[in-house]
Each structure stands twice: as structure tokens, then as C-alpha cells.
UniProtKB/Swiss-Prot annotation:
Residues 265-310, 345-374 form a coiled coil. Residues 410-420 have a biased composition (Basic residues). It comes from Caenorhabditis elegans. Residues 184-199 have a biased composition (Basic and acidic residues). This is Uncharacterized protein T07A5.7. Residues 85-103, 399-408 have a biased composition (Polar residues).
Length: 420
């Protein structure tokens, strides 16, 4: 050993002999509890002094400076050691730990004591990113228990929760058998476990398909409701606009000035724009590849369902299973049909949205002329009393009407909220 450098082997021998240990009290803790080391072996490691003529170093070569709250961190966070035989509902093992495994041992601890780097020889470096993780802790389990590790912080587990749509929610799939568990089971037990797993998978499949059908039916109901409201509002707005056009023209109540004619939509132009909107949407529907694919998919599943229904061997079978060929074909056909109907309704909704936008634009143009300041008094006096009263009602309605909430906008917002 030189004056300024200790032999690496001597340093490692000292560290290995003095790293954290369990007391007799910790070993007496029952299997269901969690053993916790209340103190650290960090203070037990001897300081190997080296010569420092310039007095630059204030600590030994195998020590590192500690912060003021180091003692609190050691006792509070770094020394929880859950046994590997803990139940599934308990907390996950600490990060960057190594777990020794033994089939005959009663105590299995995950030590997270002192992390020693070969280069820096740093202690308890929690921020290192060496990718070290426990591989043996998830491969073996203690006898009579199953310990399922959760996802680490690098791969968060996404949990999607939804209300059950049927009285029997899907059952959680059991974990795979380990080699030790497989060797301890008979062939009959393995076959029984396989049948139970198939039954659970069939129930889960049936539940997922029914959930998807229910979601599509809910979306279709919302789309039908929107179309009903949009149809009623469009009819009312269109009748009001057409009635307003009857008061425009030479010698009539309202006269459009020549300089304002280029910005005003006349009745003939308005009708042409409505027809153009319908033609554009119809053309987009005919050229839609998505709609064509959904039609082919529906025909495919429908033919598969007809084939399964007419299968003589399946008719003679009295077994009623969740995942039978006929049941799968029926669910697939129903889902394909609902998706096709939903796509068709989307084009109708798009047509109503464009027509609603055009109606709102034209009504805003007409609204500014419906007042007595812009009206021709002589033309107004020539009108029958009923028409005069109706003109006054239109003036009040268009003047006092607040900007209405667009049905198309509210429908889009509700659709986005349901998808989220």
C-alpha cells in the first residue's frame, strides 16, 4: 500500500465486512410484517486515513461528505425492506435493489443500503442511472405466496377504469406459472387451470365486446338527438329567412342600396348555396374510403355470422359458451353495423353544420335591415294590416334576439368530452 493510495482490494474487504446487517430483533419479526433497519452501517465503516501534506482533504478516501439532513434521509426513506412474500396489495419493492432468492429460506429481504461505485465510491447515490433492477425478484416466489411487482417509474402503468356495463365485470387474468409451481402440479391440475383460464378469457371477451356495443349505441343516440334538434332549428330559421326576403325589393318595405348589394346575399344566391352544400356533402360521402371499408367489413362479418348460424354441427351442440364461434360472429357483426351507421350519420351531421353556418351568416345580413330607419314608409303603408303586424314582429325578434348557441358547436364539445 502506497502513502497516497490504498489498495482497492483492502478497501473492498473493509466495506464488505461492515455493510448493513440485521439485528436479532429484526429477525424475530413475523413473516407478514416489514423489517426496517433503524440505523445505518455507514457510521460503522472505518476511515482509512491517507497522507495529505497540503491538507486538501478533510475526510478519508473511502468516505464522502454528507448533507445536514443525511441522517433523516437514512432513517426515513432508504431502509424499508419489504419481504418478497408480501401480499399483492402491499407496496412495491424499493428501486435499484437486489433480492437474494432461496427456496428453503424463510426470510427474503430486498436490501437498499449502500451503493458503492467503482469509480467514485459514492454512498447511497439515489440519482444514478445505471439501469440496474431486480431480475430475480419477479422470477421466483416464496412457497405458498404470489408476489406481483408493479411497473417502475420509468414505465408507468396506465389504468383505465369504467363502470361495468353488465352484472359480471371481467375477471383479472391470473399470472403465469413459474417453473417451480409447474413442477409441483399434476397434469390434471394444469389442465383444470387451463380450462379456468379459457373460461375467464371468454367472459372478458364477451364483456369487452358488449361494452364496445354499448358505447357505439350511446354515440348513435347522441347523433340522432343532434340531428332531430338541428332539423327543427333549421326549419324554423329557414322559414324566417324566406319570410324576411319577401319584404325586400323595389317598391317594397326594405330596399338594398346599390353599394351594399355586393355584400348582400340575395334569395336566389342563398338557395343556390344551400344546394351546393348538399351536393358537396353527398360527393364526399360517395368518395369516402372509410365508408367503403366499413361496408366491406360489415358484409364480411355478416357472412361469417350466417355461416356459423347454418353450421349443422354447431346446431347439434348443446354447449352454451361465451366465446363460441356463433357468439363471436354475432358480436363482430353488431359492432361493424353500428360503426357503419355512425359513419353515415357523421356525413349528415356535417351537412347540418355547413347549412347552419350558411343560415347564420345570411340571417346576420338580414338582421341589420329590419328596423324602421331602413324601411320605406310608403311601402310599409301599402301593406295589409296582417303583413304590417308581422313586419313589426320580425323587427322585434331580430333586434332583441341574442346570439344563439350553435347546436353544431355544442354537439362537437359534447362529443369531445365523451371521448375523453
Amino acid at each position: 500500500m502506497t502513502n497516497n493510495q490504498n489498495e482497492l482490494g483492502d478497501v473492498m474487504d473493509v466495506l464488505e465486512d461492515n455493510i448493513g446487517y440485521l439485528t436479532d430483533r429484526d429477525r424475530e419479526i413475523p413473516e407478514t410484517d416489514v423489517a426496517v433497519i433503524k440505523y445505518s452501517a455507514w457510521w460503522e465503516i472505518p476511515v482509512l486515513e491517507t497522507e495529505d501534506p497540503l491538507d486538501f482533504l478533510t475526510i478519508g478516501n473511502n468516505q464522502c461528505p454528507a448533507s445536514d439532513d443525511w441522517d433523516k434521509l437514512l432513517n426515513a426513506e432508504l431502509y424499508d425492506m419489504p419481504r418478497r412474500s408480501q401480499a399483492n396489495s402491499e407496496s412495491t419493492p424499493p428501486e435499484h435493489t437486489w433480492s437474494g432468492t432461496s427456496e428453503l429460506g424463510n426470510y427474503h429481504y430486498s436490501y437498499n443500503d449502500i451503493s458503492i461505485g467503482m469509480d467514485a465510491m459514492s454512498m447511497n447515490n439515489r440519482n444514478r442511472d445505471d439501469g440496474f433492477s431486480s431480475s430475480s425478484s419477479s422470477s421466483q416466489t416464496s412457497e405458498g405466496s404470489e408476489w406481483l411487482p408493479e411497473e417502475t417509474e420509468f414505465k408507468p402503468k396506465k389504468v383505465v377504469t369504467s363502470e361495468p356495463l353488465s352484472p359480471t365485470p371481467p375477471e383479472t387474468e391470473t399470472r403465469r406459472l413459474t417453473k417451480v409451481q409447474r413442477r409441483s402440479m399434476t397434469d390434471q391440475e394444469v389442465e383444470q387451470r387451463r380450462k379456468e383460464a379459457n373460461k375467464k378469457n371468454s367472459k372478458n371477451y364477451n364483456f369487452n365486446k358488449k361494452s364496445k356495443e354499448a358505447k357505439l349505441k350511446e354515440d348513435l343516440e347522441k347523433n340522432h338527438l343532434y340531428i332531430e334538434r338541428a332539423t327543427a332549428q333549421e326549419k324554423q330559421t329557414l322559414e324566417r329567412i324566406m319570410e324576411c326576403y319577401t319584404y325586400f325589393g323595389d317598391g317594397n318595405v326594405l330596399v338594398i342600396h346599390q353599394d351594399a348589394m355586393q355584400n348582400f346575399t340575395e334569395k336566389e344566391v342563398f338557395e343556390e348555396k344551400l344546394e351546393q352544400v348538399d351536393m358537396d356533402v353527398a360527393r364526399a360521402r360517395e368518395q369516402s374510403q372509410e365508408l367503403k371499408s366499413l361496408k366491406k367489413l360489415y358484409q364480411k362479418h355478416r357472412q361469417a355470422y350466417i355461416t356459423a348460424t347454418n353450421d349443422k354441427a354447431l346446431k347439434k351442440s348443446k354447449i352454451n359458451t361465451y366465446g363460441s364461434r356463433k357468439s363471436r360472429a354475432l358480436h363482430s357483426m353488431n359492432i361493424a353495423e353500428l360503426e357503419l351507421k355512425k359513419c353515415i350519420l357523421q356525413f349528415k351531421i356535417k351537412k347540418f353544420e355547413r347549412r347552419e353556418k350558411l343560415l347564420e351568416e345570411v340571417e346576420n345580413q338580414i338582421k341589420q335591415y329590419f328596423n324602421f330607419k331602413e324601411s320605406n314608409h310608403a311601402g310599409y303603408m301599402r301593406l295589409p294590416q296582417e303583413r304590417q303586424n308581422r313586419f313589426e314582429e320580425l323587427c322585434k325578434t331580430l333586434k332583441t334576439s341574442s346570439p344563439k348557441t350553435s347546436i353544431a358547436g355544442s354537439h362537437r364539445r359534447s362529443t369531445r368530452s365523451s371521448e375523453n
